[in-house]
Amino acid sequence: TCHDDDNLVLPEVYDQDGNPLRIGERYIIKNPLLGAGAVYLDNIGNLQCPNAVLQHMSIPQFLGKGTPVVFIRKSESDYGDVVRLMTAVYIKFFVKTTKLCVDETVWKVNNEQLVVTGGNVGNENDIFKIKKTDLVIRGMKNVYKLLHCPSHLECKNIGSNFKNGYPRLVTVNDEKDFIPFVFIKA
């Protein structure tokens, strides 16, 4: 088991303007690869509340600007108001919602390994982390990958998969398999 070293301050995560990501600020999470797009929330199963975490693509039915997210710290003592590399955060869609669906905006991973909403801030299994990548993508800087890091289990990369006709975010078992992300201030 590794413990956080109190004296170790991890590097900040940066958006496309070169500014550190701030807790509680709104961002669009975007896959910068050609043909890919921003992450968004949608209802694809006739559910009471939308809960699918999808990725826009450069094809007509999947075009779009994305749904803003906010990052929430795991605990108040976590490194001030900036998001840092490999530090536990909760990811929450910033959307207008009904009273009924107000608790359906925090990301989690379901039994099918799909990223969905319905997570809870405070639930150790709904934690995500951000890791820097070495990818060089033209016109982009600060390219990262997202990891799902449930309590007592190994972190898994977030990748994408077409499931039931939709580009879904999923966890993947292969360390080399992931989709890159950049963060754009919303």
UniProtKB/Swiss-Prot annotation:
InterPro entries, per database record: Kunitz_inhibitor_STI-like_sf, Prot_inh_Kunz-lg
Gene3D superfamilies for this protein: 2.80.10.50
TM stretches of this protein: none
SUPFAM superfamilies: STI-like
Disulphide bond pairs: C49-C101, C149-C155
Signal peptide (UniProt feature, chain positions): 1-7
Record keywords, A-Z: Disulfide bond, Protease inhibitor, Signal, Thiol protease inhibitor, Vacuole
Gene Ontology, cellular component aspect: vacuole
Pfam families in the record: Kunitz_legume (PF00197)
Location(s) in or outside the cell: Vacuole
One Gene Ontology MF term: cysteine-type endopeptidase inhibitor activity
PANTHER family: CYSTEINE PROTEASE INHIBITOR 1 (PTHR33107:SF44), KUNITZ TRYPSIN INHIBITOR 2 (PTHR33107)
Primary role: Probable inhibitor of cysteine proteases. May protect the plant by inhibiting proteases of invading organisms.
Family, as annotated: Belongs to the protease inhibitor I3 (leguminous Kunitz-type inhibitor) family.
Name of the protein: Cysteine protease inhibitor 10
Species per Swiss-Prot/TrEMBL record: Solanum tuberosum
Taxonomic classification: Eukaryota, Viridiplantae, Streptophyta, Embryophyta, Tracheophyta
